[in-house]
């Protein structure tokens, strides 16, 4: 897996006695200079990559013009027509992923780090870890009948995943302390933890 870091300045990399200057002076004005790192965070290479809403090789980037969502390229699976240009659905939590630009059958829009893709109301949406709109949005390490999605409020657009009555939370797990007992609450299908 290759991680991408955006670079906005001239970089000088030193390898032993040799100093090599890398830069992206020739990138299009609608592109960013990207440093690609190998999985072990060592240098791989530099490249120009078109910004969200533009396609090309990074040296020439043309706007993905549109009037309707269906006019956006297939690589914008989680994109939309926004002010006449195809872009990622930022209001649904998607961000531009230039590593996949110009790759067939790869979505150029991805969820931000620390969030997951879910379907809600017929649309894809990125929900930050530990937050939810429904109980099943809580991470898979929670046991379904031991967790609830607290209603959105002071937390923004999403609720938060909380353990049911009596349970204690340890990272992403809900557990009933040894001195208590798990009891099934059939009136509201869930487990609760009682003395």
Swiss-Prot record:
It comes from Acanthamoeba polyphaga mimivirus (APMV). Keywords: Signal. This is Uncharacterized protein L881. Residues 1-16 form the signal peptide. It comes from the Viruses.
